[in-house]
């Protein structure tokens, strides 16, 4: 199962964890190399970082479809308004047998019919593009909902904090070969011994 990618991407410098959680060079390097591309740490602290799958195509497709569909819809509405709102001209002039056909009026009326047909076609194309836009948007939202999982709070805390042992919060880099921290004072050879005050006895 791939690790969840609900972690918000932030480009701010410095650690963004609570105080007392992570210490040492290793944790700060992990925070530094965690960029806004969706890089997340795996459950294994020693394993390589796992990149979150990026899906730019659904978002890009529905944005392009929405823009194109809106533009075509506006053009179609304008063409239909022109075709139906503008009154046609009379093609025949005269009465009875003396009927003269006005070619300009015929061309004008034919242009109005072409505007109506073009407006209908543009509206149909806009509807198809808007349907594709809605389809891609639903695919993107469903994929985000199905692949999103809650983060495990124990997976983020790679270093455990103990109240009695503060030197365990340090990174292994700051430890020598014997396992002792460089910043902690050396252990006393006498162990934890209590200091007693001895007073000399007075001669009576």
Swiss-Prot record:
It is found in: Membrane. Pfam families: Neurensin. Residues 178-204 are annotated as: Disordered. Keywords: Membrane, Transmembrane, Transmembrane helix. One of its GO terms (cellular component) is neuronal cell body. Disulfide bonds: none annotated. InterPro entries: Neurensin. The keyword Transmembrane helix applies. The chain crosses the membrane at residues 66-86, 122-142. Its main location: membrane. Residues 190-204 have a biased composition (Polar residues). The keyword Hydrolase does not apply. GO terms for biological process: nervous system development. It is a multi-pass membrane protein. May play a role in maintenance and/or transport of vesicles. Belongs to the VMP family. This is Neurensin-2. It comes from Homo sapiens. The gene is NRSN2.
């Amino acid at each position: 199962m791939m690790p969840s990618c609900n972690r918000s991407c932030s480009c701010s410098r410095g650690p963004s964890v609570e105080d007392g959680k992570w210490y040492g060079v290793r944790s700060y390097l992990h925070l530094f190399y965690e960029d806004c591309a969706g890089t997340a740490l795996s459950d294994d602290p020693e394993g390589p970082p796992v990149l979150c799958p990026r899906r730019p195509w659904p978002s890009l497709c529905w944005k392009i479809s929405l823009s194109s569909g809106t533009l075509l819809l506006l053009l179609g509405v304008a063409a239909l308004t022109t075709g139906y709102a503008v009154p046609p001209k009379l093609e025949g002039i005269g009465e009875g047998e003396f009927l003269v056909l006005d070619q300009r009026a015929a061309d004008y009326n034919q242009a109005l019919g072409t505007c109506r047909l073009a407006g209908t076609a543009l509206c149909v194309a806009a509807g198809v593009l808007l349907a594709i836009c809605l389809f891609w948007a639903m695919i993107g939202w469903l994929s985000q909902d199905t692949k999103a999982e809650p983060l495990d709070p124990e997976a983020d805390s790679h270093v455990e904090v103990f109240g009695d042992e503060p030197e365990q919060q340090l990174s292994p880099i700051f430890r020598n070969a014997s396992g002792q921290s460089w910043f902690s004072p050396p252990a006393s050879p006498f162990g934890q011994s209590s200091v007693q005050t001895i007073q000399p006895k007075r001669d009576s």
